[in-house]
């Protein structure tokens, strides 16, 4: 990992989502997403509450989020098209009202976005689009569970020339303008977080490889030796990446160089560039290490972000289930690619949850 002590001016990004459908047994509530084409690569999503009760959910990392998060998955000839945007880690308590959406039964919200701004579709041709996953639901501005969403499968024919003309949301500018340095308390906090990440990841890797089978089953939904080896390998890769501040595959900024932090975002990753950036909230909201099972802290947030970066371990993880209740509702194949599952498992190993 290359630790960046001087920020640089950067431009914008665009949408992120789950390529894997999430099944939640026995869930009476749900959100139905209807996708339609309104332009060559411009997509409209209508999200409907199909349940019988009002539901309040976090729309960050979902439709209505103005940040470049993944809202749909794209496929060409059954192969997923690379997404070039951000993956955000959010707070789970004290969420601001503007991060929440309440839908009455049968009510809808709409969102429009251009998929060519966040994926290279200049090749044109037939693209298949869908969107499935889990959305955190809240009570009194605190995440208390999750609700599943699923969409129709939409197939569109993309005009290559028109798609190529769409402005890319993610642009890494030349480092001509130096902004504030990472120093003082923030530098100290991040250095401590990295040291703690090394310890947590290494302990979790050992536990994954040869520790309690019941704990591994709780988080990863299997005890197969191949899955345990894969989890251990990813966690060891995270430990190795966090151990060096002068080399490695990622670049870590201690401040919001992209301008995508909000009052609810702790940190974010640009997987396509292997870049991680912390938000102000990372320092003001999170303890260095929590003493509470399943709670957030700086070390597990950094660990969470490292798992997103494919340069650390490929493929990078997604955000398929956020928080303990959603993460432990995933299947084994989904848990293996879910960032929060690794953070929660490391926390559980550290605190003997």
From Swiss-Prot:
Disulfide topology: 182-254, 261-279
Subcellular location: Secreted
Enzyme Commission number: 3.4.24.39
Reactions catalysed: Preferential cleavage of bonds with hydrophobic residues in P1'. Also 3-Asn-|-Gln-4 and 8-Gly-|-Ser-9 bonds in insulin B chain
Major subcellular site: secreted
Required cofactor(s): Zn(2+)
Highest rank taxon of the organism: Eukaryota
GO cellular component: extracellular region
Recorded family membership: Belongs to the peptidase M35 family.
Taxon lineage: Eukaryota, Fungi, Dikarya, Ascomycota, Pezizomycotina
Pfam families referenced in this protein's UniProt entry, alphabetically: Peptidase_M35
Molecular function (Gene Ontology), one example: metalloendopeptidase activity
Active site: 305
Signal peptide as annotated in the record: 1-19
One GO biological process term: proteolysis
Prosegment residue ranges: 20-176
Binding site for Zn(2+): 304, 308, 319
Record CDD domains: M35_deuterolysin_like (cd11008)
UniProt function note: Secreted metalloproteinase that allows assimilation of proteinaceous substrates. Shows high activities on basic nuclear substrates such as histone and protamine.
Record note on cofactor: Binds 1 zinc ion per subunit.
Protein keywords: Cleavage on pair of basic residues, Disulfide bond, Hydrolase, Metal-binding, Metalloprotease, Protease, Secreted, Signal, Zinc, Zymogen
UniProt protein name: Neutral protease 2 homolog AO090001000135
Enzyme class: hydrolase
């Amino acid at each position: 990992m290359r630790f960046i002590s001087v920020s640089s001016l950067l431009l914008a990004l665009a949408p992120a989502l789950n390529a894997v459908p999430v099944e939640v047994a026995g869930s009476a509530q749900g959100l139905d997403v209807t996708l339609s084409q309104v332009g060559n690569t411009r997509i409209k999503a209508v999200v409907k509450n199909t349940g019988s009760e009002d539901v309040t959910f976090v729309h960050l990392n979902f439709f209505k989020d103005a940040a470049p998060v993944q809202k749909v998955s794209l496929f060409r000839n059954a192969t997923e098209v690379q997404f070039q945007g951000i993956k955000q880690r959010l707070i789970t308590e004290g969420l601001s009202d503007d991060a929440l959406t309440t839908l009455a039964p049968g009510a809808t919200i709409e969102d429009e976005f251009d998929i060519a701004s966040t994926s290279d579709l200049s090749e044109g041709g037939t693209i298949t689009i869908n969107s499935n996953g889990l959305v955190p639901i809240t009570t009194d501005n605190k995440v208390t569970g999750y609700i599943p969403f699923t969409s129709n499968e939409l197939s569109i024919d993309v005009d290559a020339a028109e798609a190529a003309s769409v402005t890319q949301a993610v642009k890494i500018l030349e480092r001509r303008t130096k902004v504030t340095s990472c120093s003082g308390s923030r530098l100290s906090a991040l250095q401590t977080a990295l040291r703690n990440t090394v310890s947590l990841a290494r302990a979790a890797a050992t536990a994954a490889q040869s520790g309690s089978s019941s704990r591994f089953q709780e988080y990863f939904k299997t005890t197969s030796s191949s899955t345990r080896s894969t989890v251990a390998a990813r966690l060891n890769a995270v430990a190795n990446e966090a151990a060096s501040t002068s080399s490695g595959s990622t670049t870590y900024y201690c401040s919001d160089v992209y301008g995508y932090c909000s009052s609810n975002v702790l940190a974010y990753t640009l997987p396509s560039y292997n870049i991680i950036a912390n938000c102000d909230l990372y320092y003001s909201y999170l303890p260095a290490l929590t003493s509470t099972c399943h709670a957030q802290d700086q070390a597990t947030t950094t660990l969470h972000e490292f798992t997103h970066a494919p340069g650390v371990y490929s493929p990078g993880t997604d955000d398929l289930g956020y928080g303990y209740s959603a993460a432990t509702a995933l299947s084994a194949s989904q848990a293996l690619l879910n960032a929060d599952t690794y953070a929660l498992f490391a926390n559980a190993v550290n605190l003997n949850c």
